[in-house]
A protein has these predicted regions:
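Catalytic alpha/beta active-site cores
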Residues: 1-241
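Active-site loop/helix belt of alpha/beta enzymes
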Residues: 244
Length: 244
């Protein structure tokens, strides 16, 4: 259906909505009953109106584009490849594979998948620079987050020095790294805390990269050679905050 039905209804002011709600409350206090305070310290109202946006100067009329992504655990290349093709046939626009070990063949995993039109994300459950260097296509995003692994497991993959050596080699080859923000969400951080931890997490990497002359990465470039960061963010249970 392409025809909008909103024009068939008269506009209702925020004041009229609130009066209707107060009538339905039958004497109960509006603020005590319906307004709640979020973990971020925001008083959340039971409804919002376009009038609430009039005093906000930084709203935008459009949103950034996004792709439907299917996550597949790649224990077996053939089975995972079959699942990937099925997901793409059902509307998936990008694929995220969780890779359990370095013996897995990326070529077999991605067989007959159009890598020029389908973004591919690989989450490695191990750390190996040579595995990354042998990836068949530059458009593949390999999520490398040694700090994230330390936070999640309490341990480095090997040790601090070896992990950073692998990290340096991977970043030099791909010009990319990732920040797994989902760990903070899953351990109870609110949205403000997640943003703060994600920025601090990213800053640790940027400081390291800036101080590692062998990487020779220049900041501030806006071309294909610019350093790219992939943020993996979990979706929480607060519907209104998630869609904002």
């Amino acid at each position: 259906m392409t025809k909008s039905l909103f024009n068939d209804f008269s506009p209702v002011s925020a004041k009229a909505w609130k009066q209707k709600i107060q009538l339905d409350l039958k004497g109960a206090d509006y603020n005590d009953t319906l307004i709640w305070k979020s973990l971020e310290g925001i008083d959340v109202k039971p409804f919002y109106h376009t009038e609430d946006l009039e005093s906000i100067s930084h709203t935008i009329d459009s949103t950034t584009s996004w792709n439907i992504c299917e996550t597949i655990y790649a224990q077996n290349e053939a089975h995972a490849n079959k699942k990937a093709h099925y997901a793409l046939s059902k509307g998936a626009e990008s694929l995220r594979f969780i890779i359990p070990n370095k013996e897995l063949s990326i070529q077999a995993l991605l067989k007959n998948i159009d890598l020029t039109s389908t973004p591919i994300y690989l989450d490695l459950e191990f750390l190996d620079a040579e595995f990354v260097k042998n990836s068949p296509h530059t458009s593949i995003h390999i999520n490398t987050d040694i700090i994230g692994n330390l936070i999640k497991s309490g341990n480095w993959f090997t040790n601090l020095k070896e992990d950073h050596n692998h990290f340096d080699a991977i970043v030099k080859h791909t010009n990319k790294f990732s920040v797994n923000v989902s760990t903070y969400q899953n351990t109870g951080a609110n949205m403000v805390q997640q943003l703060a931890y994600a920025l601090a997490h990213t800053n640790e990497y940027l400081n390291h990269i800036h101080n590692t002359e062998a990487l020779n990465i220049k900041f501030g470039e806006s071309n294909n050679n610019a350093l790219k960061v992939n943020f993996n963010v979990s979706i929480g249970t607060n519907y209104f905050f998630e869609i904002a």
